[in-house]
Amino acid sequence: MAIKRSSQDPHSPLHPPHISPSEKKNKPHQDHRLLETGRLEETEAAEDSIRPRNLNDYIGQKELKEVLKIAIGAAKVRKEALDHLLLYGPPGLGKTTMALILAAEMGVNCKITAAPALERPRDITGLLINLKPGDILFIDEIHRLNRMSEELLYPAMEDQRLDITTGKGKSAKIRSIPLSPFTLIGATTKIGALTSPLRDRFGLIQRLRFYEVDELCLVVLRTAKILNAKIKEEGALEIARRSRGTPRIANRLLKRVRDYALVKKIESITEALAAEALDKLNVDSRGLDWTDRLVLDTIIQQFRGGPVGLETVAAATGEDAKTIEEVYEPYLLQIGYLNRTSRGRIATEAAYQHLGYDYIFNRKIN
């Protein structure tokens, strides 16, 4: 069993004590959406107001921007549409924003949709037929396209035509409709879930990575300026450190800290104020929330640090296994607090230290 270091404050939100089953059922009220990386309907308009409008304003992803600048320049010289582009990586890193920027740089329109909305063939055919020369069609969660919609994209991407089958059996006929040259930009968090025929039709396949703290600090400072929120650089750094490497989360946390400063009648966001506000929101110094810490604490306390299976962790914490795997684990893996092995999940020494436990490598001590 892991031993809690007595030097830690037992009531600190950053180093919680062992979480009992009763405490798990009565978890503190927290807006879990703060650290979610998915877009929220009520914040989409606000997000649009702070999106960068061109590549020069887009912070981070240096390697990606260099590749895209070359692609844009070449397409303009040839007077052609951009090559089809597949963007993959964790949510909240700016895939939709990049599609809008590319449309602005090329001087064309960008139509945005998501694969779950394209349930019937006519949903995607309507979009394709109405595209003008050079337009961009952005499909989010493209790995979730159904087979029929995906197959309609094959000739559209390769030959700028739409093949529609009419009739059945021996009387079936294929009618080809010419399309304007266009660019398909697909976004996915699961590139491995794409079929090879679809993936191979993209001329450019680029990965978006998590942001560094200094990059997120620039994001926070830029957003604060747009929102007319006064903030010290140290305050921006504190928010950046707790933003899980994700701009969308950084902007969301900034707004909550801004509100906290407003209620407290404090003119400028300092490091101390940002830390105080985020501690009250249960977002700790590494960006972990209550559920992140619960998952790690459960693995350490109940299963001696692991290895333990995902379903077992889910049952022990009362959280959905898919939610743990897709929402919480990616960041825990990224910062080195969790290892995912064939035998199960293992909490690392860094996780022990962060939660205030003594790390015992050989946990099978009698």
Swiss-Prot record:
Mg(2+) binds at T96. The keyword NAD does not apply. Coiled coil: none annotated. Residues 13-211 are annotated as: Large ATPase domain (RuvB-L). GO terms for molecular function: ATP binding; ATP hydrolysis activity; four-way junction DNA binding; four-way junction helicase activity. Residues 212-282 are annotated as: Small ATPAse domain (RuvB-S). The keyword Cytoplasm applies. Its EC number is 3.6.4.-. It comes from the Bacteria. It is an enzyme of class 3 (hydrolase). NCBIfam families: PRK00080.1, ruvB. Belongs to the RuvB family. This is Holliday junction branch migration complex subunit RuvB.
